Curated annotation (Swiss-Prot):
GO terms for cellular component: bacterial nucleoid; cytosol. It holds the Pfam family YbaB_DNA_bd. It comes from the Bacteria. Gene3D superfamilies: Nucleoid-associated protein YbaB-like domain. The keyword Hydrolase does not apply. Binds to DNA and alters its conformation. May be involved in regulation of gene expression, nucleoid organization and DNA protection. InterPro entries: YbaB-like_sf (IPR036894), YbaB/EbfC (IPR004401). It is found in: Cytoplasm, Nucleoid. It comes from Anaeromyxobacter sp. (strain K). The keyword Cytoplasm applies. Keywords: Cytoplasm, DNA-binding. This is Nucleoid-associated protein AnaeK_3694. Its main location: cytoplasm.
Length: 103
């Protein structure tokens, strides 16, 4: 096996992975909870880009409900972002599973 060839292929894979990681910020996912009372937008790096709370969800006497709605929406958005990031990184690596490279 040609070592030079393997080194070139490794460099190509490294560049493809770096490019894909940069593009994670461009991935956009949204999730909601409480029938749309709380909405979260997130990018592929699992950074929240927008959080919307319907005034109907704000009850000073039931703070726990709002906390639960926000938690549920954020967790759903994280799951969607991770899935999208994994798909993006899988394309960059040609389907090779490399632990810890997404996001």
């Amino acid at each position: 096996m040609d070592i030079q060839y393997l080194m070139r292929q490794a460099k190509k894979l490294e560049k493809a992975m770096a490019d894909a990681k940069e593009k994670l910020a461009e991935i956009a996912v949204e999730a909601e909870s409480g029938g749309g009372l709380v909405k979260v937008a997130m990018n592929g790096k699992c950074e929240i880009t927008r959080l919307t709370v319907d005034p109907k969800a704000i009850d000073p006497n039931d703070k726990a409900l709002l906390e639960d709605l926000v938690t549920a929406a954020v967790n759903a958005a994280v799951e969607k972002a991770r899935t999208a990031a994994d798909e993006s990184m899988s394309k960059a690596t040609g389907g090779i599973k490399i632990p810890g490279i997404a996001g």
